[in-house]
Regions:
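Extended, folded cores of ATP/NTP-driven motor/assembly subunits in large transport
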Residues: 1-285
Length: 285
């Protein structure tokens, strides 16, 4: 595989709402971060089956991208950074304890702690249960609960990354196709597991549930402008943007972003022909 720096495709578009139609959104996880999405291990790809028997979850996304028509552009962006455990100073912790109850909020925990708490609750090891509680002695986990515990423990055992996913569909009015929006928003459904899934962030989606929510259209115009600017700047983790990221581990990231295998082919996305050769004898080391 040869990796080269690609030209920034976002610089080729000057967004003008009078000439270009735009639809976009950000994605987040439906459940708490420790609950995993469906990964390549769940698809059985780690068993190294023959190419013709592989079911690569990224295939449907590539097929969709290959199906868009003339004058249409679909952008998909995944931003990551190494997850840092959330640390607070002592005085801030005490302040949060004071205001937590009246406002019904909760202090943010790091990813591993959150996952361990989920497991502890399911194992009846949290503070609400005492050691001499007869309920614990009679407690038997169901098969589904055991699988959930194993999945969460497997997820938090791997390095986590703060993640942001953003998608945009652009086209001139004559080429704008609503069915392309459906395909774009459905391109992450193959990662849905019994525990978690991707879902659009309503306040970051360029749409409103009812006309009365934006009668003049000014809020929608502002959302589109903001989403486009955030996309081209790869903005997300800075505090000023006030967007809560979620966490995916290395297994999950490798599932949603990887080089597609040779079995994934589409007529409109041809592969570059290449062959392996020995390195030149004068290659500096």
């Amino acid at each position: 595989v040869e990796v080269v720096e690609a030209e920034d495709y976002t610089k080729k578009i000057k967004y003008d709402p009078k000439e270009i139609e735009l639809f976009g959104s950000m994605f987040t996880l439906d459940e708490d971060d420790p609950y995993p999405i469906k990964t390549y291990i769940d698809y059985g790809l780690e068993a190294d089956p023959k190419e013709e028997f592989k079911i690569d979850p990224i295939a449907s996304t590539i097929e969709f991208l290959g199906s868009i028509g003339k004058g249409e552009q679909v952008w998909m962006q995944t931003l990551i950074r190494a997850h840092k455990k959330y640390k607070k100073k002592v005085f801030l912790e005490e302040l949060l304890k004071t205001i937590k109850k009246p406002f019904g909020g909760k202090s943010r925990k790091n990813w591993e702690e959150e996952g361990k708490e989920i497991v502890d609750v399911m194992m009846k090891r949290d503070e609400e249960y005492k050691e001499d509680d007869p309920k614990i002695k009679m407690f038997v986990q169901s098969k589904g609960e055991q699988q959930t515990i194993e999945s969460v423990e497997r997820a938090i055992s791997k390095p986590g990354f703060d993640t942001a996913i953003r998608v945009i569909y652009l086209a001139e009015e004559e080429y704008f196709d609503v069915s392309t929006i459906s395909g774009m928003m459905s391109s992450f459904k193959q990662y849905t597991s019994g525990l978690n899934r991707f879902k659009p962030v309503s306040k970051e989606t360029t749409d409103f549930d009812a006309p009365w929510m934006d009668p003049l259209g000014s809020r929608l115009a502002e959302r589109k402008r903001k989403l486009f600017n955030h996309y081209i700047r790869r903005a997300h983790f800075e505090t000023r943007h006030n967007i809560r990221d979620f966490i995916l581990n290395t297994e999950e990231l490798a599932t949603i972003f990887h080089f597609p295998p040779s079995v994934v082919e589409t007529p409109t996305l041809p592969r570059m022909e290449a062959k392996k050769v020995e390195p030149p004898p004068n290659l500096p080391l």
